[in-house]
């Protein structure tokens, strides 16, 4: 009971300041807040839940730098990483790992699919945003379509019930990148080299949607702070609640051979990476896939 009053007090204070960022290391606290507070104090259509998938969705293949063995990092990884950083295609590393079946994907939170389903079944809009790139990617015709299908097929994660009448939007009002634009597809925003906070603001404008409470889950405190600023410029009537997800269960150190092989494999894949996206002539999001050249 005491915790409930504390949370209500936080919401009250946040409603004056219009923002609050809460530190969490699992979904448990967030689920508890929905059960005890959000579901009771708001109707579903007054809420918007945004999950930032980048570092939150899957466990990392390697520990963070501060947890790596110092000798391994300095003598082995640093020279290899220099080779990667010199390559202009370095920005695609996350997407290469994601789309390559040889790299095991393990959810940070095994209960995340249930969390998404519970929110969705409660009729609360829940969407996701990621920093991937849209359009053609190696042998994948449209990454944004592949990604939504991949999450649903392999992990039972489905955001498509939110905004079902707007399941494919191309943000051609924003800057293009490699002849592609940011896209909203089946509940997932793929930012395509645009700031994710800027993407979210454009999404709200496109939807003409002003939620009373905007709830964002992200592993980046910088993104949460940026989103807070974007929302304040959009409307003074939105309460922003950010959950800074900081799970300290990082992978254990492996031997030198593991890291050497991993990075060399990535360098090889980066060098072979292909993207073929012809200039878009029609950006109408209605009807067929607007990237489809077979009109």
UniProtKB/Swiss-Prot annotation:
It comes from the Bacteria. InterPro entries: DUF2608. Keywords: Signal. Residues 276-295 have a biased composition (Low complexity). Residues 1-19 form the signal peptide. It holds the Pfam family DUF2608. This is Uncharacterized protein RC0398. The lineage of its organism: Bacteria, Pseudomonadati, Pseudomonadota, Alphaproteobacteria, Rickettsiales.
